[in-house]
């Protein structure tokens, strides 16, 4: 596994945000629902995106990816309904092709998915939802098979937790099933709205995305379309926190500020200076910032994918803070690494208690998942001396041109390959 070497740097300047990874993946999966050409713009060049494209190709789809322009074109028939383990093991979002393939051609099978190791992330919500909309689910030697059955005229799927992946999976699958599907306690993330917009451009009838109740009125057939992916709010939040944690100032461009209201609320409480524009934000670190208490919750709450990064920022705050993780309750592998850098933190159940320190100190730390790795890079940039972050391949799953973007902001950063990133 490769490593990233960083030294103390004040981040400043401008950075442009890419299309959202967490939109690109379900949108690519939804393109399975038609044989006509679907064109996506602002597609980020990421290893996870490449994996999803490989999955589409293994089904028989024709996929063209212009990496320089960020354009993907998908068309053609599905000829293979089994997804290979080598692809599925890399990424959890791969599971979201099961329903669309089975809905279109009658059945599909896939091994259990992989992805970041950040605690329990069961697929039960997906499977129970698929059953509610008429699918027969069976298990055989570690593989899940979905077979299209008879759907009721009106199906209600209640999600015990507003799972983003399950909401997207059921929305897309139900789009070409007969009758009405109602998803209760649906996830409300902006990426859900983006998926609804794509599906409706393809001829679907989906309503309510962005609320806790989504209604899908099935249609017989979908068609091709063109669609531009929304900006990546998590990438934006990562660079914003990086600028502030290193006592810098900068402008983060190509964002939708309304998608980050929970972050603005937290940062303004700490004393950060935030100036929001129509599609950009200017941020400036105060000389001293203050601790605060954060509850990590499903959208519109504070996002779990920014929890590791905000811990770095709060570790250098004046005063104490608490961060309670209510989405992935064991997502704290990065805490031990931050403590090794001098942070004063302890975990009690699903809460991190933080007492701010004046400085962090560079050392060798290990990236454990995508967002934790990004957080450790930020910690290294804010720390005294040199920091080496090992096992960093995770970061290339979710941050396009991450080394170049940090460098443009003034970071002293270098990637040492130990196995080339899969992009």
Curated annotation (Swiss-Prot):
A GO-annotated cellular component: cytoplasm
Reactions catalysed, as given in the entry: phosphoenolpyruvate + UDP-N-acetyl-alpha-D-glucosamine = UDP-N-acetyl-3-O-(1-carboxyvinyl)-alpha-D-glucosamine + phosphate
Keywords: Cell cycle, Cell division, Cell shape, Cell wall biogenesis/degradation, Cytoplasm, Peptidoglycan synthesis, Pyruvate, Transferase
Tagged with keyword Repressor: no
Binding-site positions, UDP-N-acetyl-alpha-D-glucosamine: 92, 305, 327
GO MF assignments: UDP-N-acetylglucosamine 1-carboxyvinyltransferase activity
Top EC group: transferase
UniProt cross-references to InterPro entries, sorted A to Z: Enolpyruvate_Tfrase_dom, Enolpyruvate_Tfrase_sf, MurA_subfamily, RNA3'P_cycl/enolpyr_Trfase_a/b, UDP_GlcNAc_COvinyl_MurA
Source organism superkingdom: Bacteria
Chain sites annotated for binding phosphoenolpyruvate: 21-22
UniProt record, GO biological process: cell division; cell wall organization; peptidoglycan biosynthetic process; regulation of cell shape; UDP-N-acetylgalactosamine biosynthetic process
Active site: 116
Pfam families: EPSP_synthase (PF00275)
Entry keyword annotation includes Cytoplasm: yes
EC number(s) from the headed UniProt entry: 2.5.1.7
Modified residues (2-(S-cysteinyl)pyruvic acid O-phosphothioketal): 116
Pathway in which this enzyme or protein is active: Cell wall biogenesis; peptidoglycan biosynthesis
NCBIfam families: murA, PRK09369.1
Family assignment from sequence similarity: Belongs to the EPSP synthase family. MurA subfamily.
Biological function: Cell wall formation. Adds enolpyruvyl to UDP-N-acetylglucosamine.
Protein's recorded name: UDP-N-acetylglucosamine 1-carboxyvinyltransferase
Organism of this sequence: Fervidobacterium nodosum (strain ATCC 35602 / DSM 5306 / Rt17-B1)
Native organism taxonomy: Bacteria, Thermotogati, Thermotogota, Thermotogae, Thermotogales
Gene encoding the protein: murA
């Amino acid at each position: 596994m490769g490593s990233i070497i960083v030294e103390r740097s004040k981040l400043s300047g401008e950075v442009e945000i890419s299309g959202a990874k967490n939109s690109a993946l379900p949108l690519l999966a939804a393109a399975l629902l038609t044989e006509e050409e679907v064109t996506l713009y602002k597609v980020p060049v990421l290893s996870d995106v490449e994996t999803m494209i490989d999955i589409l190709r293994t089904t028989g789809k024709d996929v063209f990816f212009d990496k320089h322009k960020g354009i993907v074109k998908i068309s053609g028939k599905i000829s293979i309904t089994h997804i290979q383990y080598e692809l599925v093991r890399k990424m959890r979002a791969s599971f979201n092709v099961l329903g669309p393939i089975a809905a279109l051609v009658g059945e599909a099978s896939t091994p259990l998915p992989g992805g970041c190791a950040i605690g329990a992330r069961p697929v039960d919500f997906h499977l129970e939802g698929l059953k509610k909309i008429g699918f027969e689910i069976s298990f055989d030697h570690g593989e899940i098979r979905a077979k299209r059955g008879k759907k009721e005229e009106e199906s209600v799927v209640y999600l015990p937790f507003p799972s983003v992946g399950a909401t997207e999976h059921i929305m897309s699958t139900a789009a070409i099933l007969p009758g009405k599907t109602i998803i209760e306690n649906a996830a409300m993330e902006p990426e859900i709205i983006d998926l609804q917009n794509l599906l409706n451009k393809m001829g679907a009838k989906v309503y309510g995305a962005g609320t806790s109740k989504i209604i899908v009125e099935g249609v017989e057939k979908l068609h091709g379309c063109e669609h531009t992916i929304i900006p990546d709010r998590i990438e934006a939040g990562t660079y914003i926190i990086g600028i502030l944690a290193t006592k810098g100032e900068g402008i983060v461009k190509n964002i939708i500020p309304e998608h980050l209201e929970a972050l603005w609320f937290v940062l303004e409480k700490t004393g950060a200076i935030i100036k929001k524009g129509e599609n950009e934000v200017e941020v400036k670190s105060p000389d001293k910032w203050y601790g605060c208490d954060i509850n990590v919750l499903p959208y519109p709450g504070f996002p779990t994918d920014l929890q590791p990064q905000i811990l770095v920022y709060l570790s250098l705050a004046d005063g104490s803070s608490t961060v309670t993780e209510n989405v992935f309750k064991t997502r704290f592998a990065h805490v031990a690494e931050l403590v090794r850098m001098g942070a004063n933190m302890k975990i009690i159940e699903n809460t991190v208690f933080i007492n701010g320190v004046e400085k962090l100190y560079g050392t060798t730390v290990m990236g454990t998942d995508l967002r934790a790795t990004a957080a450790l890079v930020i910690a290294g940039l804010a720390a005294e001396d040199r920091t080496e972050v090992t096992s960093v391949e995770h970061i290339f799953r979710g941050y396009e041109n991450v080394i170049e973007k940090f460098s443009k902001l003034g970071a002293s950063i270098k990637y040492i390959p130990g196995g080339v990133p899969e992009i």
